[in-house]
Each structure stands twice: as structure tokens, then as C-alpha cells.
Design a protein with these regions (language model features):
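Short, basic/aromatic recognition patches
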Residues: 1-21
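Zn2+-dependent cytidine deaminase-like catalytic core
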Residues: 38-135
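Short beta-strand scaffold segments in enzyme catalytic cores
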Residues: 24-34
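Conserved hydrophobic/aromatic pocket- or pore-lining residues that grip, position, or stack substrates
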Residues: 9, 25, 58
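Flexible, active-site-adjacent loop/turn segments at secondary-structure boundaries
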Residues: 22, 35, 49
Length: 164
């Protein structure tokens, strides 16, 4: 089950990458039905929107659905603090992550868990989707390090550091 939805999140990340954007995709799924409520990818470059991360795009696409207490957010990369806050705010009880290798710390995972949110990190040795997420993010970081830092709030300010 996790592989299917993470594969879709990866496809969305790849879509963002081919549009010269940051390769992060996310899918919000209803646990009871398996229905995809919303999906999206990072849109910083494409839409000039610094808060349109993959998770935010998925939440936006899900619209005004009110019972998110039985959903799972699949994300190709460990969420940043902004997206972590949105996950907590909307009461999403489970987050499945494809890539933590390209994150600089586990702060957001620890925060989610401290709020009672189940966090599942897929193992890239057993999940092809997770391995793909890690490889794509690493490639992007090598090719466009400035854009990677900008997306995580690093920009030109040396006091800021990306969490993810």
C-alpha cells in the first residue's frame, strides 16, 4: 500500500523536476477508502510561490474536506517546519516519508512524533519508490544547490539553515 502512493508522490516530484522546480511530491490519502484526496508537487519556481511545497499543494488540492483525522500524507522528502506545522494543524495522523537521507536533521520527524503523529520512513533497500526519492533529491541538490537552499528558507541569509 505505501509503495503505490509513494510511487505516485515520486512521479509528482519528477514532474516538478522536469519543470525546473524542486523535486518534492506529496499525496494525501483517505485511510478508510484509499481514495486520493489531493496531490501535488513543489511550485516555488513554476508559480513563484515560496510556500507551495509538495505537502501544501496536496492539502490545497484536497480542498475543504474536514475529516482529515483518518488520512495519510505521503511525501517524497522529510517535511520542512512549515509543512510539518500544516500536518499538525490539519490533524493528519500519519506521514510516510520516502527520503530522510537528504535532510539535514530529524527535527521535524521528532516534532511530528511528539505531537502523536505516526511517522513511517520507507527503507530504500526494500522500497524502490524510496530509493528513487533519495536519488532524485540528491541529483537535484548537486545540480542546483542554490535553489535547494532557497526552497528550504536558506537563501542568502547565513543565519538560516535548511531543516530538510
Amino acid at each position: 500500500m505505501h509503495e503505490k502512493h509513494m510511487t505516485r508522490a515520486f512521479e509528482l516530484a519528477l514532474q516538478g523536476y522536469t519543470q525546473t522546480g524542486c523535486p518534492i511530491g506529496a499525496v494525501l490519502v483517505d485511510n478508510a477508502t484509499g481514495e486520493v484526496w489531493g496531490e501535488g508537487h513543489n511550485g516555488l519556481v513554476q508559480e513563484g510561490n515560496p510556500i507551495l511545497h509538495g505537502e501544501m499543494a496536496a492539502l490545497r488540492a484536497a480542498g475543504r474536506r474536514t475529516h482529515r483525522h483518518d488520512t495519510t500524507m505521503y511525501t517524497t522528502l522529510q517535511p520542512c517546519f512549515m509543512c510539518t506545522g500544516a500536518i499538525v494543524q490539519f490533524g493528519i495522523p500519519r506521514v510516510v516519508i520516502g527520503d530522510t537521507a537528504n535532510a539535514s536533521s530529524d527535527e521535524t520527524i521528532r516534532f511530528l512524533r511528539s505531537r502523536g503523529i505516526e511517522v513511517i520512513v520507507l527503507d530504500p533497500t526494500t522500497s524502490e519508490a524510496a530509493a528513487n526519492c533519495i536519488a532524485l533529491a540528491a541529483r537535484f541538490r548537486r545540480e542546483r544547490p542554490e535553489q535547494w537552499l532557497e526552497d528550504w528558507g536558506g537563501g542568502p541569509n547565513p543565519r538560516l539553515r535548511p531543516v530538510c
